[in-house]
Amino acid sequence: MYNTVKQKLLEGKPVIGGTIQTPDPQIYLAMAHSGFDFLWIEMQHSPMTYQEVALMIWAGRGAPAIPFIRVPDATEGDVQKATDIGALGIIVPMVNTIAKVKAAVKYASYPPRGSRSLGGGQYGALWGSDYRQTANENIMVVGMVESPEGVEIAEEMAAVEGVDVVFVASSDLSSFSELKQGEAKYEAMVSKVRDATLAVGRTVGGPFAWKEREGFHFFQAPPAEVLARRGAMALLAEVTDGIAETEGSER
């Protein structure tokens, strides 16, 4: 199995993904070699094109971090393009119906499980000449719960063959429910999703801030620009006596 994220989850280990939302190969490479298990490539809330993302994934071939793409929607075109350019994870936003997540699994999977067609792409150069035979075993589907409607179908969603992770989108769940984290009704929804997902043997995901929550193993870390800002602030906080002796060297 070349999807190391899936392998780690099968072993009961937590995984963390850094978020990419700008089409810069250098940023992608820095994140891909920073220790993240995967990269959450954000195509729902960014203007990035599949061509730009394909170039980043190719630049990062061989990096430890596995490419996951949050597609704009669970359409055949979006899922097909994402898998053809080498994503091993399809993150499906706003799953409010079982039909939506089933469609994602169908389009991400080759027959007999799905209806993904053969086409040109860089997947073979990235993941091996036997990709057609191994893709279904390695590609993951992550369904996102972002609303009370998603909460209600969490167990049924997790039970769909081909769904690996049910992810609680903390901010959107708050927005759509008009409840705040920490409030009893909000926490009850989170617990319902967690318990329902674990009951059918699937993985529960959430934001990195929830890394200490019981039962969660799949986490989304902040985007690269946020991490860059935090890193710069931490570096400057260490400065006590002016610039380094050699300009640009570590202090």
Residue ranges, per PLM feature:
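Short, acidic/polar
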Residues: 20-33, 73-81, 148-160, 206-210
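C-terminal alpha-helical cap/extension of soluble enzyme domains
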Residues: 116-127, 139, 145-152, 184-251
